[in-house]
A protein has these predicted regions:
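A general structural signal marking secondary-structure boundaries and capping sites
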Residues: 25, 47, 121-124
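CheY-like receiver
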Residues: 53-123
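Two-component/phosphorelay signaling modules centered on CheY-like receiver
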Residues: 11-35
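Conserved acidic carboxylate
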Residues: 8
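Acidic, metal-coordinating helix/loop segments flanking the phosphotransfer/catalytic sites
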Residues: 36-53
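Non-catalytic signal-transmission and effector/linker regions of two-component phosphorelay proteins
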Residues: 1-5, 15-18, 124
Length: 124
């Protein structure tokens, strides 16, 4: 089973993102476990037990950059879809992030990121 983690600092954004991800996955007949985290410490503690297949990272500014760097260093094979309020596209490229976009969080952008990840991994 796939596990998709959402790490955000805004509760409503996390709920909306989970709904967008759920809709996309249902269309693809994939039914992952979706977990939402608003606390980086809790998120990274949980990854020691279960490494998510994909992480949707939506944290502002440098905290998002730090989380992306930390996540990539710990789990280089984990898929990352990263949304930021700042243009960290060059950092995302350097970190081999599967998909980067700038806020606002929109369903179409999340779907594009998931499509790229699914295509790279040939998930069926």
């Amino acid at each position: 089973m796939y596990c998709i983690a959402i790490l955000t600092d805004q509760e409503q954004e996390g709920q909306d993102s989970a709904e967008y991800i759920r809709n996309y996955c249902t269309e693809k007949h994939v039914f992952p476990l979706i977990e939402i985290y608003q606390n980086q410490e809790q998120f990274f503690a949980q990854t020691l037990k279960v490494v998510p297949t994909v992480v949707f990272l939506a944290l502002p500014g440098v905290s998002g950059l730090n989380a992306a760097e930390h996540l990539r260093s710990l789990y280089p094979k984990c898929g990352i879809i990263w949304c930021s309020d700042l243009d960290f596209s060059l950092h995302a490229f350097r970190l081999r992030i599967e998909y980067f976009f700038m806020k606002p969080v929109e369903e179409q952008k999340i779907k594009e990121g998931l499509s790229i990840w699914f295509e790279c991994k040939k998930v069926r």
